[in-house]
């Protein structure tokens, strides 16, 4: 075996061993110590992160991709399933980022969840999730990818419903798992199609043997899977609802790692779809619709976590647009930069929520810049990175995506929607900063404001550094697989920046108008549309079940009762027998002439029958 391959497979084995060790210690019947989460879990993830840097440096030095197949799981005459790992730039870059972000979030969770009696179990769930995510990222066949896919799904369900005493948390967890189940149908059907038509689940073999086939059907299944997992329009309501879980869960699963699994699936299998115009157009239009719709919903939300959740969904839509543009590497770059600042925004939100007695309404915050200067500064940095401010992390990916979109010869409507959503990103980001950091405090004086704990400061600080320099580091060290546009007109080059600045100006105007409005709640249709999330949950979660119940009630009470019990049952017997009864009773009238006539007729009939 080549030494590079040996080192890569050994490091992955070490990462899995380090992450599994804390889980194995929990099998001991004696209960864990109070600080087990910090001594075992956090240390294991930190060590795994440091180990994962080794393959990254080797890859930077040599630039070689490696596939390691070490164990045959199952085989038949035409089909085999191996344990196979793929070390390409997607898995080698994303694994350290996932470990780094998780390390920061778990340290924050040790402060955020310190009063929870089951904190050790919470950390165990997060660790299981991380293992499933790394399996998904490094998988080289659909079977392993499916194991990781379902693993992150079930851990998401358990962690959203962590506070299971609350009805909202249970509903949100069920909602998440049902929407994901719809997406999983697409993935399972695609896997079945690949197994029956290509006789292989190995990704390289699938690429090689599918060149002559029409892949529209399985690609639509994969897009459905990505729509469910990455909260694209139609299957998006679960992501804002998932904010019922603890803030560390929102920061890890529902912003930086799990929700990008759907996009990652499409990036990993992109060679299948790069020449299929139907699939690419579907991705482009679906992504553009998602990014604008969810950005519109974020404009009027007042729950700080919901705003950040909708911004996540909006950025996932932008990644889907990028896949539709045939630029998977740019989508992956945006995944990497987005992980840092979005996780940091959630941690800053969690810190502020905790400091204000669990208050999540931004209208009841304000003036936090003087009270929690570090957290507020990082919240501002994260918001600026999200809007694509030049030379922060988000700029390098977002600007490249908008450039690729501007210079492509594709759907102009998708371009318009995406640029409008980019402008809205600036609006809701500045709105959060305005309501949370600026102005005067609008909360009770008894709020226990405290940001002196290193478990709060250090994770946010690490992610802040990532939000500032990650984009520069990644773009300066990796060559793009497709040559970017070298020259373009100045207006096109500045398009992303101009719409962002216009969004910031609109946000400032709106924020100042907020203090001058006469009615507390606007009655505009547009405001209601945005605030009610486009009436989507009301229609899908309320109207559809109501119509189903009404239909069921109609079938049960009217169709079954009236048809079976009345028309066919007792009343039916009466209605069928009544004509015969009336006919026979009319015949028996006591008239001798009639009887005599009938007697002669019947006698004559009998004689005729005997004669013939």
UniProtKB/Swiss-Prot annotation:
One GO CC term, this protein: mitochondrial inner membrane
Keywords, ordered alphabetically: Electron transport, Membrane, Mitochondrion, Mitochondrion inner membrane, NAD, Respiratory chain, Translocase, Transmembrane, Transmembrane helix, Transport, Ubiquinone
InterPro entries, A to Z: NADH_DH_su5_C (IPR010934), NADHpl_OxRdtase_5_subgr (IPR018393), ND/Mrp_TM (IPR001750), NU5C-like (IPR003945), Proton_antipo_N (IPR001516)
Name of a matching Pfam family: Proton_antipo_N
Membrane topology: Multi-pass membrane protein
Localization per Swiss-Prot or TrEMBL: Mitochondrion inner membrane
Regions crossing the membrane: 4-24, 48-68, 92-112, 122-142, 145-165, 176-196, 215-235, 247-267, 279-299, 307-327, 330-350, 376-396, 410-430, 463-483, 494-514, 591-611
Any GO MF annotation of the entry: NADH dehydrogenase (ubiquinone) activity
UniProt keyword Iron-sulfur, yes or no: no
Enzyme nomenclature, EC number: 7.1.1.2
Catalytic activity: a ubiquinone + NADH + 5 H(+)(in) = a ubiquinol + NAD(+) + 4 H(+)(out)
Top EC class, one word: translocase
Top-rank lineage group of the source organism: Eukaryota
GO biological process: ATP synthesis coupled electron transport; electron transport coupled proton transport
PANTHER family assigned: NADH-UBIQUINONE OXIDOREDUCTASE CHAIN 5
Function of the molecule: Core subunit of the mitochondrial membrane respiratory chain NADH dehydrogenase (Complex I) that is believed to belong to the minimal assembly required for catalysis. Complex I functions in the transfer of electrons from NADH to the respiratory chain. The immediate electron acceptor for the enzyme is believed to be ubiquinone.
Similarity section: Belongs to the complex I subunit 5 family.
Protein name in the entry: NADH-ubiquinone oxidoreductase chain 5
Name of the encoding gene: MT-ND5
């Amino acid at each position: 075996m080549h030494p590079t391959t040996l080192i890569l497979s050994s490091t992955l084995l070490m990462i899995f061993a380090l992450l599994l060790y804390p889980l194995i210690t929990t099998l001991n019947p004696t209960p864990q110590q109070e600080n087990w989460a910090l001594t075992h879990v956090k240390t294991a993830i930190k060590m795994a992160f440091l180990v994962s840097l080794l393959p990254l440096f080797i890859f930077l030095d040599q630039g070689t991709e490696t596939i390691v197949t070490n164990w045959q799981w199952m085989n038949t005459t035409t089909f085999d399933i191996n344990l196979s790992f793929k070390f390409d730039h997607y898995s080698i870059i994303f694994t350290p980022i996932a470990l780094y972000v998780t390390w920061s979030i778990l340290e924050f969770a040790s402060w955020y969840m310190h009063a929870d009696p089951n904190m050790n179990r919470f950390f165990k769930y997060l660790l299981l999730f991380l293992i499933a995510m790394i399996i998904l990222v490094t998988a080289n066949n659909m079977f392993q990818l499916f194991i990781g896919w379902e693993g992150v799904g079930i851990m998401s369900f358990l962690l959203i419903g962590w506070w299971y005493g609350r009805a909202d948390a249970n509903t949100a967890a069920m909602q998440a798992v049902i929407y994901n189940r719809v997406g999983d149908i697409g993935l399972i059907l695609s896997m079945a199609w690949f197994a029956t038509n290509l006789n292989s689940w190995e990704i390289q073999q699938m690429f090689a043997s599918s060149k002559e086939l029409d892949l529209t059907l399985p690609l639509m299944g994969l897009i459905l899977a990505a729509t469910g997992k990455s909260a694209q329009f139609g299957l998006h309501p679960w992501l804002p609802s998932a904010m019922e879980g603890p803030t560390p869960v929102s920061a890890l699963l529902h912003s930086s790692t799990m929700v990008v699994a759907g996009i990652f699936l499409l990036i990993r299998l992109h060679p299948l779809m790069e020449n299929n115009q139907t699939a690419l157009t579907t991705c482009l239009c679906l992504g553009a619709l998602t990014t604008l719709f969810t950005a519109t919903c974020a404009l009027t939300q007042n729950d700080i976590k919901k705003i950040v959740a909708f911004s996540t969904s909006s950025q996932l839509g932008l990644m889907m647009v990028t896949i539709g543009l045939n630029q998977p590497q740019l989508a992956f770059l945006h995944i990497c930069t987005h992980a840092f600042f979005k996780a940091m925004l959630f941690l800053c939100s969690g810190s502020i929520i905790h400091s204000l007695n669990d208050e999540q309404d931004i209208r009841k915050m304000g003036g936090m810049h003087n009270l929690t200067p570090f957290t507020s500064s990082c919240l501002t940095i994260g918001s600026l990175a999200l809007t694509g401010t030049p030379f922060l992390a988000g700029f390098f990916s977002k600007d490249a995506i908008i450039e690729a979109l501007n210079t492509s010869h594709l759907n102009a409507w998708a371009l318009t929607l995406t640029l409008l959503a980019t402008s809205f990103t600036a609006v809701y980001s500045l709105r959060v900063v305005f309501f949370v950091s600026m102005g005067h405090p609008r909360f009770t004086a008894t709020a226990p404001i405290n940001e002196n704990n290193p478990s709060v400061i250090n994770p946010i600080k690490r992610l802040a550094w990532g939000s500032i320099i990650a984009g520069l580091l990644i773009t300066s060290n990796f060559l793009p697989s497709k040559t970017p546009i070298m020259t373009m007109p100045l207006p096109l080059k500045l398009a992303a920046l101009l719409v962002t600045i216009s969004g910031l100006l609109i946000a400032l105007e709106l924020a100042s108008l907020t203090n001058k409005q006469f009615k507390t709640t606007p009655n505009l249709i547009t405001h209601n549309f945005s605030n009610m999330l486009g009436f989507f949950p009301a229609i899908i979660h309320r109207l559809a079940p109501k119509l189903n119940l009404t239909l069921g009630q109609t079938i049960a009470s009217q169709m079954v009762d009236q048809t079976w019990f009345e028309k066919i049952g007792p009343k039916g017997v009466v209605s069928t027998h009544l004509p015969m009864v009336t006919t026979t009773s009319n015949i028996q009238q006591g008239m001798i002439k009639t009887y005599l006539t009938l007697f002669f007729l019947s006698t004559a009939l009998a004689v005729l029958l005997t004669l013939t």
